A protein has these predicted regions:
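Solvent-exposed alpha-helices and their adjacent loops that cap or buttress functional pockets
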Residues: 23-25, 103-106, 147-148
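Juxtamembrane "stalk/linker" segments
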Residues: 1-34, 40-42
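Flexible glycine-/small-residue-rich
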Residues: 32-38, 84, 104, 115-117, ...
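Extracytoplasmic/luminal low-complexity segments enriched in Pro/Gly and acidic/polar residues
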Residues: 116-179
Length: 179
C-alpha cells in the first residue's frame, strides 16, 4: 500500500537526509574564514611571526578547524562544510604533513568553514562560546587571519563520502546456542 511501512521508512530517511549530510541544504548561518599569519610559511626556518618560536605557530592547524567545527555543532549548527566538503558523523579533519585533510581530501588555504543554523540563536551561541574565544586567541596570539560573517543564505553540498553500513544476523554461532 502507498501508506505502508516502506513509505514511512522512506519519509523518515528523507527527513534525516539534511542532518545526515546525504542531501544539499540551504539556510542562514555563519562563514568563518581562517588563513595563516603573514610570514608563517614553513619553508624557511625562523620565518614565523615569532622568530624564536616554532614557525608553524602562525599556521592554521587541523586542531584549529576541529575545535571550531566542534563548537559550531555545540552552538546549534544543523550542517557544516569546510572548503565545500560537507561534514558528517564519519568525517575527519586531520594533518598529513603540512596539509590539512578533510574527508581524505587535502585543503588549500584559506580555510572556509560554513555552517547553517537558526539565525536568532546560532551566531550568538557560537560567538559567546568556546569557539568565539578560540578564534579571538588565534587572531591575537598567533596573528592568524580570522573573519566571521553572518550570512542570510548559504548552500552546503551533500557529502560525497557517506556510505551505508549494516549488520546481518548470524545463525548458530558456535558456543552461543549451547551446541
Amino acid at each position: 500500500s502507498a501508506n505502508g511501512p516502506g513509505n514511512a521508512l522512506s519519509t523518515r530517511a528523507n527527513d534525516l537526509a539534511p542532518v545526515a549530510g546525504t542531501m544539499a541544504v540551504r539556510g542562514p548561518g555563519l562563514t568563518i574564514t581562517l588563513d595563516d599569519a603573514e610570514g608563517s610559511g614553513t619553508d624557511t626556518v625562523g620565518a614565523g611571526p615569532r622568530e624564536d618560536t616554532n614557525p608553524a605557530e602562525g599556521r592554521v592547524q587541523a586542531r584549529d578547524l576541529q575545535l571550531v567545527v566542534n563548537d559550531l555543532w555545540r552552538a546549534g549548527a544543523q550542517a557544516v562544510a569546510v572548503n565545500g566538503h560537507r561534514l558528517t558523523s564519519m568525517s575527519a579533519i586531520r594533518f598529513a604533513g603540512a596539509a590539512i585533510i578533510v574527508n581524505y581530501r587535502p585543503l588549500g588555504r584559506p580555510y572556509i568553514v560554513t555552517a547553517i543554523g537558526t539565525p536568532k540563536t546560532f551566531p550568538a551561541a557560537f560567538a559567546q562560546g568556546p569557539g568565539g574565544s578560540y578564534l579571538a586567541t588565534l587572531r591575537s596570539t598567533f596573528n592568524i587571519s580570522v573573519d566571521v560573517t553572518t550570512q542570510g543564505s548559504l548552500e552546503l553540498p551533500a557529502s560525497v563520502s557517506v556510505s551505508t553500513r549494516y549488520a546481518t544476523a548470524v545463525n548458530n554461532v558456535s558456543g552461543k546456542d549451547g551446541s
